[in-house]
């Protein structure tokens, strides 16, 4: 039976073992919960005919699928289950983590995000002729307290609003862009895979400065490259055939990050701003997704997704 015939045949989800393989991000420890399995089953039933169609059109019989969403959406767990389903059908699948491709390790990137925000904020004050040494002294105190991104700081100080707006604008121009992430390297990797190249070198990036290397990976027999990544539906990313979007909210993302607590300071006003910008970018890119899954595990069309996003945004501002 060919791969396309397998995908078009009746399917029942296999029983998962206690542990299944996950992505290639160094140091990741993944727990698979029943909710991941349930959502993956829903997605897989809709994905199978789409994947069969894409494979039939592929010159080298290779397809790239991405699973994207905020960090609380269950990307890694759901992508791991999808990969297991494909392998159980005898379809060669490699699960790739996009988190290997930022330009800086997490700690350094967090510092760069803050630098971008603060430099732009100061320049915004200068541009509006609102900068004074006294206000700079107040800002230094806010920097030490790490609350200069807190909207409450601007309630009685209009100049702080100028600072925050200018900083947020610059931050939005950095987050999820080629300045932060090496999209060119990922794009080249996807192109090489789809063109039939078997030996590829995949980047590995840990959380320390010297945790950086490349692993040779043999893609012989791999028909599906499954990319698990927040930016898997980005306008800077090329070569994804079937992007899947998992819906989440900034509040869920924050709760997920607090549960992991890998880098500290994750419930700060600045992190809240980062997550809000991230969600806006995901919403902006959502129209390109081939499948959208709600937080409750239901498939959505784009119009329904936008309705949920707008409702969530309005409730968040009340």
Language-model features, listed with the residues they occupy:
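Hydrophobic anchor at the beta1->P-loop junction of P-loop NTPases
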Residues: 65-67
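Conserved nucleotide-sensing/catalytic segment adjacent to the nucleotide-binding pocket
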Residues: 93-94, 101-208
């Amino acid at each position: 039976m060919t791969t396309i015939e397998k995908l078009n045949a009746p399917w029942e989800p296999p029983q998962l073992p206690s542990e299944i393989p996950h992505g290639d991000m160094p140091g990741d420890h993944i727990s698979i919960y029943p909710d991941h399995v349930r959502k993956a089953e829903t997605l897989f039933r809709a994905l199978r005919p789409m994947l069969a169609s894409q494979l039939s059109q592929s010159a080298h019989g290779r397809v790239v699928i991405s699973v994207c969403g905020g960090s609380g959406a269950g990307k890694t767990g759901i992508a791991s289950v999808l990969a297991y389903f494909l392998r159980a059908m005898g379809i060669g699948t490699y699960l790739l983590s996009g988190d290997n491709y930022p330009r800086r390790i997490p700690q350094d990137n967090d510092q760069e995000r803050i630098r971008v925000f603060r430099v732009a904020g100061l320049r915004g004050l200068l541009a509006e002729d609102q900068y004074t040494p006294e206000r700079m002294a107040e800002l230094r105190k806010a920097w030490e307290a790490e609350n200069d991104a807190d909207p409450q700081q601007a309630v009685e100080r209009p100049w702080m609003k100028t600072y925050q707006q200018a900083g947020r604008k610059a931050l939005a121009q950095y987050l999820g862009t080629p300045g932060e992430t090496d999209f060119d390297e990922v794009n080249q990797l996807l192109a090489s895979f789809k063109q039939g190249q078997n030996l590829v070198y995949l980047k590995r990036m840990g959380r320390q400065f010297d945790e950086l290397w490349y692993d040779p990976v043999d893609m012989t027999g791999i028909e599906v490259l499954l990319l698990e990544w927040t930016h898997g539906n980005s306008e800077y990313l090329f070569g994804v055939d079937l992007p899947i979007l998992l819906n989440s909210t900034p509040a869920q993302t924050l709760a997920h990050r607090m549960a992991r607590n890998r880098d500290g300071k994750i419930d700060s006003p600045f992190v809240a701003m980062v997550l809000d910008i991230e969600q806006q970018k995901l919403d902006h890119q959502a129209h390109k997704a081939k499948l959208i899954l709600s937080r409750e595990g239901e498939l959505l069309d784009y119009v329904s997704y936008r309705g949920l996003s707008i409702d969530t945004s309005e409730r968040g501002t009340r």
